[in-house]
A protein has these predicted regions:
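Positively charged n-region of N-terminal signal peptides that target proteins for export
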Residues: 1-4
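Short acidic-glycine-tyrosine-enriched beta hairpin
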Residues: 53-55, 67, 90, 96-117
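Glycine- and acidic-residue-biased ligand/ion/polar-headgroup-sensing regions
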Residues: 67-70, 76-97
Length: 153
């Protein structure tokens, strides 16, 4: 639940910034406002809300900036997750444990759609930015509770 609240709070920034009217909404790359990723994600990541609110019903789009060596242990989401690689290399796989040898790699422009409740993991070897779209309310549940960064001090 804390992960949902943290993602929702971040998306509020984007919603307020882009909800000036009901017309087309655009934002240049240089205007994207980055902040620390919520506690449900490993430290070192940065998140930017582009549209919608992941904590509420409806569609949303966020970006996640990850440094080289960033690892997100096996987890799942209650809804479909759609990921597009903006820059760098995004490594991902399905299963109950992070498996670097069994992972697939996507470069800029690459796309993956992960079905709801599918255990998966991700990692980077170089600095990487991905765009994540989905339907809320969005959340994250780690396969191994000990991997959940929000539960660590």
């Amino acid at each position: 639940m804390r992960a949902l609240v943290a993602l929702s709070a971040l998306a509020l920034i984007a919603t307020v910034a882009m909800a000036q009217d009901s017309g087309p909404k655009g934002i240049s790359a240089s205007a994207i406002k980055w902040g620390p990723a919520p506690g449900a994600l490993p430290k070192g990541g940065q998140l930017a809300g582009l549209s919608g609110d992941p904590g509420k019903s409806g569609t949303f789009t966020i970006r996640l900036k990850m440094p080289a060596g960033y690892k997100i242990p096996a987890h799942k989401h209650p809804h479909v997750e759609r990921i597009t690689v903006i820059s760098g290399e995004f490594h991902f796989g399905t299963g109950d444990k992070l498996d670097e040898k069994g992972a697939s790699k996507l470069g800029p422009g690459g796309f993956v759609e992960l079905p709801a409740n599918t255990n998966h993991y991700a990692f980077t070897k170089v600095a990487t930015v991905v765009q994540i779209s989905g339907d809320g309310p969005f959340g994250i549940a780690y396969v191994n509770a000990a991997d959940d960064p929000s539960k660590k001090n």
